[in-house]
From Swiss-Prot:
Residues 133-329, 703-900 form the ATP-grasp domain. SUPFAM superfamilies: Carbamoyl phosphate synthetase, large subunit connection domain, Glutathione synthetase ATP-binding domain-like, Methylglyoxal synthase-like, PreATP-grasp domain. Keywords: Amino-acid biosynthesis, Arginine biosynthesis, ATP-binding, Ligase, Magnesium, Manganese, Metal-binding, Nucleotide-binding, Pyrimidine biosynthesis, Repeat. It comes from Nostoc sp. (strain PCC 7120 / SAG 25.82 / UTEX 2576). This is Carbamoyl phosphate synthase large chain. Mn(2+) 2 binds at residues 300, 302. The gene is carB. Mg(2+) 1 binds at residues 286, 300.
Amino acid sequence: MPRRQDIQKILLLGSGPIVIGQACEFDYSGTQACKALREEGYEVVLVNSNPATIMTDPETADRTYIEPLTPELVEKVIARERPDALLPTMGGQTALNIAVALAKNGVLDQYNVELIGAKLPAIEKAEDRKLFNEAMDKIGVKVCPSGTASSLDESKAIARRIGTYPLIIRPAFTMGGTGGGIAYNQEEFEEMAQVGIDASPVSQILIDQSLLGWKEYELEVMRDLADNVVIICSIENIDPMGIHTGDSITVAPAQTLTDKEYQRLRDMAIKIIREIGVETGGSNIQFAVNPVNGDVVVIEMNPRVSRSSALSSKATGFPIAKMAAKLAVGYTLDEIRNDITKKTPASFEPTIDYVVTKVPRFAFEKFPGSEPVLTTQMKSVGEAMAIGRTFNESFQKALRSLETGRAGWGCDKAEKLPSGEQIRAQLRTPNPDRIFAVRHALQLGMSPEEIYELTAIDPWFLDKMQQLLEVEKFLKRTPLKQLTREQMYAVKRDGYSDRQIAFATKTTEDEVRAYRKELGVTPVYKTVDTCAAEFEAFTPYYYSTYEEETEVIPASKPKVMILGGGPNRIGQGIEFDYCCCHAAYALKGAGYETIMVNSNPETVSTDYDTSDRLYFEPLTKEDVLNIIEAENPVGIIVQFGGQTPLKLALPLQDYLRQVGNGSLVIGNGNEETAITDDQLPITKIWGTSPDSIDSAEDRERFEKILQKLNISQPPNGIARSYEDALIVAKRIGYPVVVRPSYVLGGRAMEIVYSDTELERYMTFAVQVEPEHPILIDKFLENAIEVDVDAIADHTGRVVIGGIMEHIEQAGIHSGDSACSLPSISLPPAVLNQIRTWTVQLAQELSVVGLMNIQFAVIGASSYSPQVYILEANPRASRTVPFVSKATGVPLAKLASLIMSGKTLEELNFTQEVIPSHIAVKEAVLPFNKFPGTDTILGPEMRSTGEVMGIDSDFGRAFAKAELGAGERLPLTGTVFVSMSDRDKSAAVPVVREFIDLGFKVMATFGTRRVLLENGLNVELVLKLHEGRPHVIDAIKNQKIQLIINTPSGEEAQTDARLIRRTGLAYKIPIITTIAGAKATVAAIRSMQNTTLDVKTIQEYCPNF
């Protein structure tokens, strides 16, 4: 059937901010869907609150609303735009839940909007656990013994019926297993059941008999209107059931299924998608298989594009989201061409002749108090994927792609083996490092059978790991120079990196590389082509392996290589991927052939049509040098991917200089390209030189530059031991901020108020980076922090991209603080001082491209405000997408063109753009996933994502940002206030404003006394140890609608922490800073006076 002619305008919902369980795979799917629908001539309207997405760029959709994803505001977009159809399957669980809400409350009928991609009955049948089980029963597919409950009493009755613990609890209409878990006894069960009912938007949980130890598989399935069904990919979890699939190491295609078993799953999947009624698009279906008797049960189905669809798309080259969008508007699979082969139709199931491994990345170290144990609730913050010809190769490449300091599956550092008892405990309890515990167990001589008993990891995988250990033993007893060409090939085919070979043979990585090349052992690159080389592939999407024949095709244009950011982690996420994509778009447009190198399957940068060539490879020195030697680019861009490529800049430069041929120099595309002996272009690192980057990162060098320019910074010092630290702290006075040098995301950074706290920090933190000293700065209390993004060209011209004023005071990591652009309270003199220093510093560091500087301002409203510089980063920062959306200036695109030799004048960007509207960025924090952790903000970054609120008034913009971040601010009710002594007097005017807005106020004894002295009528509430009813009772009885609680030093921490955790559990907004409280007052006032309206980014920034 050709495309539908009866619809013209389609509304697409994004997934909002990046949260655990719902990350940038939905930017990838949404961007693909927008492109596909516009190609077909439809007008596309998009709603998404996340500014750090390619999807919200003004050119992706026709009309783009960066507005909170709530049913109320999406209804306003519908009323304004009058779309014919709503496509809800591209924005994860968020979009699906909003679509269901709008269908049920009659909005879609009122405005005559049709749901496409998945109809309401299909969504409900797949998502409502009771309906799903009934549907499976009807078609004879087994489900796990289970029941659905909406109350604690119903839950207990089901537990009695099932009869045995452990039991699995899964809330309906949630993603990433939010609110779920495994209960091993009745007490745990009752607690988890209540949490699960509260977490589900429909207050419903499914209670399953535990299938712990069963094998888990997923099939990615597509169906069209003509009832054609294709299986795109099978995925096998190495970890058994009981661990969320997002936290499990997974392999595609499934490795341990016999053909007969695979056909069984395939037949079931086809029956399921037909019965549920997903007519047009993709679904992800999860199965459990009993390894003892082969029993199969279906676990669940997602009637939408999911995290696994992004992985399947990257693993096979089949663009699921794009195809799903086309199916949603009436095409059938046989009518759509495969983009990669250009010959085969989409109804041909992909075939692959390689193995793909995905490994999750965790961030437990960011959440002290949370246990690093994996369950059915997803906790990973990112993932890396690798492709190899064999499982061993793909597995080792994936582990080194994670960037956690490992070069593969061990054999990369001296290890002290744990005891047998410790290893058994690590194997029994699923945790992020269990795969390395398997290695230790095999090294201690534990049999694969015993490891299987403890882990339920399939013996096939354990056998492969045993083989890897044999290779390692062989390497350790063979001197490097005695390895023959065949042996070197065999070792590399097992995925061993040069660094691992160097460790085993007691040599260096560079020696291994030189000897390997001498033997003529270099990687070749194979194509991901959807058809196992049956047809010619037209899209250069490559992975490395060690065989004879390469499939890299020569190019006629000069090539530029962009190094991506690798797996998402806290501190380095989608914002950097956004910059890499923009570099690819801009340089492609300028006539270069762009090469993207990245290992993250969730992102737009690893879409096969973002760059001209895609290398799905680990971002290590070895892998990147191999690609440089295969492609000979004229330029390499390292300043867009965060810390990952920056760390590679100096090693790449050093190696290429040593090798002779002088084949790497620093510079920009504006010089003449020299030709070396063998007529290949010289490869240059484009943009700011690695030396300048180092002089901004290296504290001592940076301080000299600031002294030369007469720029003030807070009193500070450097310590390499606890004794050093004490001397520095005494000299500059407490409180101080302590942190290791060279970190991103404020890793291991703290504010310290005393000698004892300093001692505790030094004992813990020096282990973080032993070769780098600890930096100690005077902590500027109550300072306003300011972030500046600027851009500079090779002529020395500097233009400010945007000046953002933080809403939380200095001391809270800039990635976790809300901020406003333009500034809302800083006087012109302060802003001008900031501008002057930014320009001077960019010129002194010879910045070419982007730069981010953080300042602190003390006494902004006094007669003599003081400005201090906190740090400077001559690279793209995580605020670039936000600034670009707020001002309408595509900074990353401009910066990449500047690196190619263009000037700001040529690009027509010569002065700062100050918007007439207000944009507020707010951070989104994952505390609900880490129940043991305090919700307090500090200098270590913990947010996973961000949202943007945009309006003509600060109060409304802040209200939208809070709403987008999932905080519904109350308009009436009671505010609970408990302040540290430092903040009590500053709280008086804020509390007065809350009373003026009609709120009642409750406070603890000390805070109340100060408020009463200032003539404010405040009710007393008891602290926990003062008797009942206390503040926690008031929260649980829903007598409090808003909590303002600023943390004090060490004392009373337990009380305050419990108050904050309880507030979080009861979904009460919690504010932990005075500045945040002031912004909240402005937001509530504006919402009491006016309703929130919606407007497109194209209207806010018409010149974008």
